[in-house]
UniProtKB/Swiss-Prot annotation:
Disulfide bonds: C325-C411, C367-C395, C369-C378, C482-C502, C659-C669, C663-C675, C677-C686
Coiled coil location: none
Cofactor(s) demanded: Zn(2+)
Biased composition (Polar residues): 34-49, 753-765
Boundaries of every Peptidase M12B domain copy: 215-416
InterPro entries in UniProt: ADAM_Cys-rich, Disintegrin_dom, Disintegrin_dom_sf, EGF-like_dom, MetalloPept_cat_dom_sf, Peptidase_M12B, Peptidase_M12B_N, Reprolysin_adamalysin
Compositional bias annotation for Low complexity: 826-850
Start and end residues of each EGF-like domain: 659-687
Localization (cell): Endomembrane system; Cell junction, Adherens junction; Cell projection, Cilium, Flagellum; Cytoplasmic vesicle, Secretory vesicle, Acrosome
Segments on the Extracellular face: 209-698
Protein's name according to its UniProt entry: Disintegrin and metalloproteinase domain-containing protein 15
Top-rank taxon, per record: Eukaryota
């Protein structure tokens, strides 16, 4: 492999290193300590490109400080490429904890140690599918992937800065081969499953769930004494740890999983556990120390032990399947089998994958892996054939999705504390102070809400599309459900209304009942025996008959046990604890969804005179999986009893009842040991009852209020009508006359023909007697209404009757001429005046007074 020509250019905003506590000197020689260049305050240079500016020597760059952006020109196989790099700030969130030990055994803790951010991520210019992972902590080490067929390692020691960079193809690396027993995986999809696990910035702007949300694994790496002796300079050990963590983060990013290094512990004086070449024994010892010593003082999601000790057999690591977030089993042991960080990082990624629920890839083409042979090597393959895996297969993607939907990984949604303040840098995919968003490089930013040049929200945008509480650049309202519950032990989460991110995942606390009383919640999962069988054997699977289960697990062999001892032998269960041992199921699929059937045993048992056919299997999960599939903690094993530590124990040991008593009967305990109050009760102790403010209650109150108003209006109208009726009875016909003038209109009756007096002609107009019910209002023109307003009112009571009957007289003089002003025309559609309805049959008996009657009232002129 020819040596590459390297230059660095385009440096921007390099931050000066912050002072850190002195690191221990573990015995490195003076020459080794002088080999690492000192860090000095860096200087800012103007933007430069290859075509317009001369290259800057790499030695000068590394000796003057590490910039936040770096562009490296590189020749690979005769082709010139430019690496565009940004510091990976998600790798070291906040200021991690460093732990080492003095000769007298005193533990030294540097909480919030200022690690210089010397690791970069990026891509090759002009190659969208490429990626680069590189650390410049001490020299140069990294990985460049142009395509699945072309991958290269970069390496340059701290004392070799004047020499050319060494570039090697992945296929040329000679790493010690390692293998796990082949897992003839039966989960072979018949058709391509949808790719739901894309990187966050490629997601559609839809409501997201646990599958598509970005998860983060808070990782602690523990270096045993043999690893410390291999790298006696503590800074060198720290740099190597950072390089391994960077590759882990790079491997898991396509699965929407980030890896953050929150702590490093170095056993600088002696090993704190008993070391063993048997990885199962070593794992058991390490997990016990993690549970009792490490976890209480340094919270994390997974701990990985790195040792130089050679393991017996071909294995280079071991972990427990589907154990992430478990305080008892979330960890692994790994052998530092190569000077290349790529091989070590790939091995740790393999064991961490087991903790996340990933099984070994099936041989053949059932689990596609990018790249042709011999480059085809995925991380979860049982055997790497001397080539480190660089990618996860589609089978690994589907397995992670299934594990998440089954309730695994509640701790992965809690992001570490905020990072230490650093200078802002637009384009590093981290929202720095002064920025509103950051979607990365211009060619990878797909966020329509974010301006990738300024890292500010675009006009009209309220948020960046980097979380489930932002849709179409608008914040979802407070109370909008952003994460659905995955099982009985999960609680829904809701947007707060002021952030695009969904709150951390909250689950029911340990000991809360679930699955209709079949189990209780443990570590955020509902440990129903039926569901465990269906997760292993598919739909329709059920627990085996009690006699078959007890017989198998009390024998203590590969077909049934309560687990393995540190020496690797199977441990039989006590009869009381049999249900807490190995999973014993019936029905379902012929082949399991996890692992493969290595052997099968059938036996006929007799119980109460009845023969029972029992069948047991020996599942092969791979040599690097420490334990068989045992019943999960929290599985019900009797009335008031659950499995704790593979023993059937009282559920009260989990403390759920004690925690629930703080909620005063109006709530349950969540995973943070806080009360999750029932609706209508206020936290934190669920003692105060809230006012009913739900939409249903509000609607009922409004309906009752409206009904009350209607009742009052009806009562008022009835009272006024009764009062009006009584007044009319007291006043007599005047009330009736006023009703004829101003009462509401009534439907007119049939027209009646008016009677004529004998010897008279038909009168043009007759005066109607006041009707017994009001007449319809007469349409009077406005102009005439104004003239009538000046005239006198009609008499208030009728004229007295005259006993003298008026007799007809001879026809008098002719009628006077009609008025000069024409009468108003009848409204269209109004019946003739003579057809107006009258009371009774319409006949009119006229009584004439003895003296001439006064002229008709002014109002009657309307009818002349």
């Amino acid at each position: 492999m020819r040596l590459a020509l390297l230059w660095a250019l385009g440096l921007l905003g390099a931050g000066s290193p912050r002072p850190s506590p002195p690191l221990p000197n573990i015995g490195g020689t003076e020459e080794e300590q002088q080999a690492s260049p000192e860090r000095t305050q860096s200087r800012s240079l103007e933007n430069q490109v290859v075509q317009d500016s001369p290259p800057i020597n790499l030695t000068e760059v590394l000796q003057t400080g590490l910039p936040e952006t770096l562009r490296i020109g590189l020749e690979l196989d005769g082709e010139n490429h430019i690496l565009e790099l940004q510091q990976n700030r998600d790798l070291v969130p906040g200021r991690p904890t460093l732990v080492w030990y003095q000769p007298d055994g005193t533990r030294m803790v540097s909480e919030g140690h200022s690690l210089e951010n010397c690791c970069y991520r990026g891509r090759v210019q002009g190659r969208p599918s490429s990626w680069v992972s590189l650390c410049a902590c001490s020299g140069i080490r990294g990985l460049v992937v142009l395509s699945p067929e072309r991958s290269y390692t970069l390496e340059l020691g701290p004392g070799d800065l004047q020499r050319p960079l060494i570039v090697s193809r992945i296929q040329d690396l000679l790493l010690p081969g390692h293998t796990c027993a082949p897992s003839w995986h039966a989960f072979v999809p018949t058709e391509a499953a949808p790719d739901l696990l894309l990187e966050q910035h490629h997601l559609r702007r839809l409501k997201r769930d646990v599958v598509t949300e970005t998860k983060i694994v808070e990782l602690v790496i523990v270096a045993d004494n043999s690893e410390v002796r291999k790298y006696p300079d503590f800074q060198q050990l720290l740099n190597r740890t950072l390089e391994v963590a960077l590759l882990l983060d790079t491997f898991f990013q396509p699965l929407n999983v980030r890896v953050a290094l929150v702590g490093l512990e170095a056993w600088t004086q002696r090993d704190l556990i008993e070391m063993s070449s048997n990885p199962a024994v070593l794992l058991d010892n390490f997990l016990r120390w993690r549970r009792t010593d490490l976890l209480p003082r340094l919270p994390h999601d997974s701990a990985q032990l790195v040792t130089v000790t050679s393991f017996s057999g071909p294995m280079v690591g071991m972990a427990i399947q589907n154990s992430i977030c478990s305080p008892d089993f979330s960890g692994g042991v790994n052998m530092d089998h190569s000077t290349s960080i790529l091989g070590v990082a790939s091995s740790i990624a393999h064991e961490l994958g087991h903790s996340l629920g990933l099984d070994h890839d099936s041989p053949g083409n059932s689990c596609p892996c990018p790249g042709p042979a011999p480059a085809k090597s995925c991380i979860m393959e049982a055997s790497t054939d001397f080539l480190p895996g660089l990618n996860f297969s589609n089978c690994s993607r589907w397995a992670l999705e299934k594990a998440l939907l089954d309730g695994m990984g509640s701790c992965l949604f809690e992001w570490p504390p905020s990072r230490a303040p650093m200078s802002s840098l637009c384009g590093n995919m981290f929202v720095d102070p002064g920025e509103q968003c950051d979607c990365g490089f211009p060619d990878e930013c797909t966020d329509p809400c974010c301006d990738y040049f300024t890292c500010q929200l675009r006009p009209g945008a309220q948020c960046a599309s980097d979380g489930p509480c932002c849709q179409n650049c608008k914040l979802q309202p407070a109370g909008w459900q952003c994460r659905l519950p995955t099982d009985d032990c999960d609680l829904p989460e809701f947007c707060l209304g002021d952030s695009s991110q969904c709150p951390p995942d909250i689950r029911l606390g340990d000991g809360e009942p679930c699955a209709s009383g079949e189990a209780v919640c443990m570590h955020g999962r509902c440990a129903s025996y039926t569901r465990q069988c269906q997760s292993l054997w598919g739909p329709g699977a059920q627990p085996a008959a009690p006699l078959c289960l007890q017989t198998a697990n009390t024998r203590g062999n590969a077909f049934g046990s309560c687990g393995r001892s540190p020496s690797g032998s199977y441990m039989p269960c006590n009869l009381r604890d049999a249900i807490c041992g190995q999973l014993q199921c019936q029905w379902g699929r012929n082949q399991p969804l996890l692992g493969s059937v290595q052997d099968q045993l059938s036996e006929v048992l007799e119980a109460n005179g009845t023969q029972l056919n029992c069948s047991w299997v020996d599942l092969d999960l791979g040599n690097d999986v420490a334990q068989p599939l045992l019943a999960l903690p929290g599985t019900a094993c009797g009335p008031g009893l659950v499995c704790i530590g593979h023993r059937c124990q009282p559920v009260d040991l989990l403390g759920a009842q004690e925690c629930r008593s703080k909620c005063h009967g109006h709530g349950v305990c969540d995973s943070s040991r806080h009360c999750h109050c029932d609706e209508g009760w206020a936290p934190p102790d669920c003692m105060t009852q809230l006012r009913a403010t739900s939409s249903l209650t509000t609607g009922l109150l409004l309906s009752l209020l409206l009904l009350l108003v209607l009742v009052l209006l009806g009562a008022s109208y009835w009272y006024r009508a009764r009062l009006h009726q009584r007044l009319c009875q007291l006043k007599g016909s005047s009330c009736q006359y006023r009703a004829a003038q101003s009462g509401p209109p009534e439907r007119p009756g049939p027209p009646q023909r008016a009677q004529q007096m004998p010897g008279t002609k038909q009168a043009n107009v007759s005066f109607p007697v006041p009707p017994s019910r009001p007449l319809p209002p007469n349409p009077v023109p406005k102009k005439l209404q104004a003239e009538l307003a000046d005239r006198s009112n009609p008499p208030t009571r009728p004229l007295p009757a005259d006993p003298v009957v008026w007799r007809p007289k001879p026809q008098g003089p002719t009628k006077p001429p009609p008025p000069r002003k024409p009468l108003p025309a009848n409204p269209q559609g109004r019946p003739p005046l003579g057809d107006l309805p009258g009371p009774g049959d319409g006949s009119l008996q006229l009584v004439v007074p003895s003296r001439p009657a006064p002229p008709p009232p002014a109002a009657s002129s309307l009818y002349l």
